Curated annotation (Swiss-Prot):
Keywords: Cytoplasm, Methyltransferase, rRNA processing, S-adenosyl-L-methionine, Transferase. This is Ribosomal RNA small subunit methyltransferase G. It comes from Halorhodospira halophila (strain DSM 244 / SL1) (Ectothiorhodospira halophila (strain DSM 244 / SL1)). The gene is rsmG. S-adenosyl-L-methionine binds at G74, F79, R139. Pfam families: GidB.
């Protein structure tokens, strides 16, 4: 496992993690590489690509997290929700995905890496309305016009949605009905080698949704 490569990339982005968090991240990357050979969870085929294309922007999200319970929709191979649980193991995290092989992988990671505050649910986000989460995260799940109403049932009344977005963000914002949101901010994320423009959209849904 390229520990030195991971540490150098974290240093580039001024991300500081303690030794236990680094060990959990290494364990996660090892599990993902092993499962990926059999189940094709992600297109990345080497650890360096996983780090650059998936892990780093998930870690950057931490800077914008409010306190409280977190739900991650469309968790897939664990980005960003499982990654955030790995570096904040005391936070309550619920990982949501409709794909059975991906939820099995997420449960295996939670078990092997000792993430006792992680729950995994196999479901579509639109089907869940029993949430009281302080924050919902999403990465490459759906356009904002779909994502905001689709996650409203998961959020506490003052909860926030944090959505990782890329090159099409201006198009998505132009297509977003103003009535859907009460507040919205776009945070430019640090440039990561091998990626295009990335940003984090933080918003609160309108109360009438």
């Amino acid at each position: 496992m390229p520990r030195k490569y991971l540490e150098s990339r974290l240093e580039d982005l001024q991300i500081e993690l303690d030794a236990p968090a680094l060990e959990r991240l290494e364990g996660f990357l090892s599990l993902l590489m092993r499962w990926n050979r059999a189940y094709n969870l992600t297109a990345a085929r080497d650890v360096e690509t996983l780090i650059d294309r998936h892990l780093l922007d998930s870690l950057v999200v931490r800077r914008y997290l409010p306190a409280g319970a977190l739900a991650d929709v469309g968790s897939g191979a664990g980005f960003p929700g499982l990654v955030l649980a790995l570096i904040e193991p005391d936070r309550s995290v619920t990982l949501i995905d409709s794909n059975g092989k991906k939820t099995r992988f997420l449960r295996q990671c939670a078990t092997e890496l000792g993430l006792h505050r992680v729950q995994v649910r196999q479901a579509r986000m639109e089907a869940l309305d029993d949430g009281d989460f302080a924050v919902v995260t999403a990465r490459a799940v759906a356009p904002l016009a779909t994502l905001i109403p689709g996650t409203r049932g998961l959020l506490a009344p003052d909860g926030a949605l944090l959505a990782l977005k890329g090159e099409r963000i201006q198009e998505e914002l132009a297509e977003l009905p103003e009535a859907l949101v009460e507040a919205l901010d776009v945070h430019e994320l640090p440039a990561i080698a091998g990626q295009g423009r990335a940003c984090l959209v933080a918003c609160r849904a309108a109360v009438h949704l």
